[in-house]
């Protein structure tokens, strides 16, 4: 197919692309020669305007009011994508009206119907064009001005164009070397062959007109062959009548007649269309060919109505008037028509194919009817698709709203995520700080545990030492208890003996007092008697002296009287015995006084040291009780904490010193006991002396022989006892002081242990609180991580939803774009509608 033929197919398609015939033709040819059509369109924009003018004028020539005014109504009406109910079936009525009009016509009528069926869907397609295409169409006034300018320009170009260029263009136009075998070029070739078969004997003017038409078709971009064929058919009817009128004319008249017809037809066409339109060209060509056609061939065209003959006669008269003006043009075109004779001979070979082409035309008519049915189905499908597109637009609007809402939600979620991230960073910082604190606390706890383990070891050691000390103290306490019991028993025995002795001494004192009083009275009486006796003794001495003198005298006389009398010797012995009796009570009284004084001093010495001993034994018992209480406290405080090593060393030293002092005290007590035993012997001797005092009263001579050393020892014994008792009390005081020190140390240790226990409890509580805080922060961080994961999942879900909604918005557009090629390739299939319905259901479900 040549470039002009591709433009003939594709040119109307730019304006009327919804007809099924044009759709099939366009998609079959545009895929092959898309680049060529673009180049031709760029170079020949002016020819498009002339082709549009031709379309507007040819509609008025047909005489169809509805079809002729249809493009104007489409241009005036706004573009609407929806198809109304009354307008859906408008092409049906038009086409059936055309079929009714063409039922009685011959083979050229079929070509005319075919050309009409090609043109009218192109006109119908303007309903479905976009508003931009409708807005780009020029106004009728502008079109007329452009038509006039284009006619003048085309005339000048055709007059001054060289013959060589016209020949090449005509040959290229009619040979059709590059024509592909598609449906639309096949129909066009059939129509051209029919027209050529009716125009076999061509005249000189016909050749020139054909050449001129070839030049115009080759120069223009959109050669509307369908309109040309229809114009040829219209031009054939008046030419028959003109041929019948001028059969008797001369050759000069025949040569001039076609020229006049051509000029008259040209003038007639100037009133309606441009002079260089394809309809005018083919009219002139048809009129010139009919003058040279034989009578056998004109019988097929003699059936035209008489009304058209009258119109043609009027047109012929007008053409005769204008024929003189066109003689000069005919002379110029004479050379060009010579080149067309060779082409006419080639075209005569195609006449044999007419009967084949008639069958093809019938088949094409059937195919056209099927295509019309398919077109109606496509229109219905398109209406459904438009409805579904509206639904999809509504769904897309809803999806846009949902997208906006989701974007708002996403923005809010992003803000929340940012806040959560800030909180998460803060929590991480807190967590890091708390982990550091936890590590510090853990290190502190480890150090504390180490110190506690060391202290536990030290406590165990101290407990061991404590056990040893307790054993030692228990043994010492047992010994002390035993000694205490022994001492208490001894003390009780001493107290009993002392009480007995005191009682005895009191009795004795009373007796002695009574005796002393008696003795004092006796002494006083004796002193009185002594004085009296001294006086008597003096007297007696005097008497004794006298008596001695007398005795001497008597001895002298006795000697003299020995023999005489024995009585005077017995009287001398009696006064001697009286004197001895008087001397003895004086001596006994002196000895008794000295002995009483000694025993009184001893008793006083005994009473005086024993009273403070009683007073001192009471604090000893109290201190022993305090020691027992402290030992009980030590036993109760075994589980308490242990002091430091220095305190333990000091306590060990103090315990050692105390043990040594206790041992020294025990030794001293033993020494004192021994000394007491010795003094007991002396006391026993003193008791024996006291017991013997009674016996000594009767034996004064024996008392005079009493040892002076023993008396000195007896007088020194209470002093020694007091000294030893003082030493014993001092030792007891030292023991009490050491016991108080031990109690103070134990109390200090108890306080220290209690403090350590409290500190350990505090540390344990602090560690427990830290562990609880760490666990709580870990839980908080876990919750924050979970919230972040949830927010990330929500964001991902929203992103997926947005993508899905964007895909849903894109899908109707893509399917609307791909809908036309699918409908063109498969016009009868309804699978796309079902697919769209299913997709619409999916969209509604997803929304």
From Swiss-Prot:
Please tell me the species this chain comes from: Rattus norvegicus
Annotated region (Disordered) at 118-161
Keywords from the UniProt entry = Coiled coil
Query: Which spans of this chain does the record mark as coiled coil?
Result: 377-567
Q: What is the protein named?
A: Cancer-associated gene 1 protein homolog
Superkingdom of origin organism? Eukaryota
The UniProt gene name for this protein comes to: Cage1
**Coiled coil listed as a keyword:** yes
């Amino acid at each position: 197919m040549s470039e002009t033929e591709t433009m003939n197919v594709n040119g109307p398609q730019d304006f009327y692309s919804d007809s099924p015939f044009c759709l099939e033709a366009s998609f079959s040819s545009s895929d092959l020669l898309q680049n060529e059509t673009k180049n031709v369109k760029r170079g020949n924009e002016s020819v498009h305007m002339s082709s549009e003018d031709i379309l507007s004028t040819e509609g008025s020539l047909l005489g169809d009011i509805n079809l002729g005014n249809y493009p104007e109504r489409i241009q005036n009406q706004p573009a609407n994508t929806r198809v109304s109910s009354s307008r859906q079936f408008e092409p049906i009525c038009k086409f059936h009206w055309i079929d009714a009009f063409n039922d009685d016509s011959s083979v050229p009528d079929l070509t005319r119907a075919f050309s009409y069926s090609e043109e009218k869907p192109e006109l119908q397609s303007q309903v479905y064009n976009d508003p931009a295409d409708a807005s780009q169409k020029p106004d009728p006034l502008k079109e007329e001005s452009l038509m006039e300018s284009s006619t003048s320009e085309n005339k000048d170009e055709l007059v001054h164009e060289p013959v060589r260029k016209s020949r090449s263009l005509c040959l290229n136009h009619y040979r059709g070397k590059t024509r592909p075998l598609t449906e639309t070029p096949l129909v066009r070739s059939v129509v051209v062959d029919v027209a050529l078969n009716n125009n076999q004997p061509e005249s000189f003017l016909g050749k020139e007109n054909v050449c001129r038409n070839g030049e115009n078709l080759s120069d223009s971009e959109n050669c509307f062959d369908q309109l040309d064929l229809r114009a040829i058919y219209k031009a054939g009817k008046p030419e028959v009548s003109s041929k019948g009128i001028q059969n008797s004319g001369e050759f000069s008249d025949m040569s001039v007649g076609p020229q006049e017809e051509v000029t008259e037809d040209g003038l007639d066409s100037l009133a309606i269309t441009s002079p260089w339109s394809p309809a005018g060209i083919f009219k002139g060509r048809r009129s010139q060919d009919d003058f040279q056609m034989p009578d056998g061939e004109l019988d097929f065209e003699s059936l035209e109505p008489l009304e058209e003959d009258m119109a043609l006669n009027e047109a012929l008269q007008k053409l005769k008037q204008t024929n003189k003006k066109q003689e000069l043009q005919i002379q110029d075109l004479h050379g060009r028509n010579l080149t067309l004779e060779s082409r006419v001979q080639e075209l005569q070979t195609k006449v044999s194919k007419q009967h084949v082409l008639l069958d093809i035309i019938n088949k094409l008519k059937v195919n056209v009817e099927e295509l019309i049915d398919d077109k109606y189905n496509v229109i219905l499908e398109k209406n459904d698709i438009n409805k579904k597109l509206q639904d999809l637009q509504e769904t897309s609007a809803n999806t846009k709203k949902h997208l906006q809402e989701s974007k708002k939600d996403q923005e809010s979620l992003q803000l929340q995520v940012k806040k959560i991230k800030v909180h998460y960073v803060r929590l991480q910082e807190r967590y890091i700080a708390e982990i550091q604190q936890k590590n510090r606390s853990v290190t502190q706890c480890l150090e504390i545990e180490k110190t506690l383990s060391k202290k536990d070891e030290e406590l165990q050691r101290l407990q061991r030492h404590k056990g040893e000390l307790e054993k030692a103290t228990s043994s010492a306490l047992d010994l002390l208890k035993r000694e205490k019991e022994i001492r208490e028993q001894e003390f009780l025995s001493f107290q009993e003996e002392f009480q007995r002795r005191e009682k005895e001494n009191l009795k004795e004192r009373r007796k002695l007092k009574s005796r002393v009083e008696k003795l004092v009275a006796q002494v006083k009486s004796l002193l009185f008697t002594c004085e009296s006796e001294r006086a008597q003794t003096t007297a007696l001495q005097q008497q004794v002296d006298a008596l001695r003198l007398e005795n001497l005298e008597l001895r002298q006389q006795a000697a003299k009287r020995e023999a005489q009398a024995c009585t005077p010797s017995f009287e001398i012995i009696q006064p001697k015995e009286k004197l001895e009796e008087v001397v003895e009570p004086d001596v006994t009284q002196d000895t008794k006084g000295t002995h009483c004084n000694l025993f009184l001093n001893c008793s006083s010495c005994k009473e005086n040291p024993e009273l403070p001993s009683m007073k001192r034994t009471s604090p000893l018992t109290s201190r022993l009780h305090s020691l027992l209480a402290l030992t009980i406290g030590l036993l109760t405080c075994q589980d308490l904490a242990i002091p430091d090593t220095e305190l333990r060393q000091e306590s060990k030293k103090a315990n050692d010193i105390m043990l040594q002092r206790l041992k020294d005290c025990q030794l001293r007590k033993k020494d004192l006991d021994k000394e007491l035993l010795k003094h007991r012997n002396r006391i026993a001797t003193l008791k024996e002396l006291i017991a013997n005092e009674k016996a000594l009263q009767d034996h004064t001579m024996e008392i005079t022989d009493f040892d002076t050393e023993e008396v000195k020892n007896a007088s020194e014994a209470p002093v020694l006892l007091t000294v030893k008792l003082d030493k014993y009390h001092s030792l007891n005081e030292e023991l009490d002081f050491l016991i108080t020190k031990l109690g103070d140390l134990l109390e200090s240790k108890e306080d220290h242990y209690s403090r350590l226990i409290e500190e350990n409890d505090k540390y344990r509580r602090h560690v427990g609180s830290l562990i609880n805080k760490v666990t709580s922060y870990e839980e908080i961080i876990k919750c924050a991580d979970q919230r972040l994961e949830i927010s990330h999942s929500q964001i991902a879900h929203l992103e997926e939803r947005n993508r899905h909604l964007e895909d849903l918005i894109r899908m109707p557009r893509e399917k609307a774009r791909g809908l036309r090629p699918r409908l063109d390739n498969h016009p009868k299939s309804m699978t796309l509608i079902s697919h769209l319905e299913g997709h619409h259901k999916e969209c509604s479900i997803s929304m």
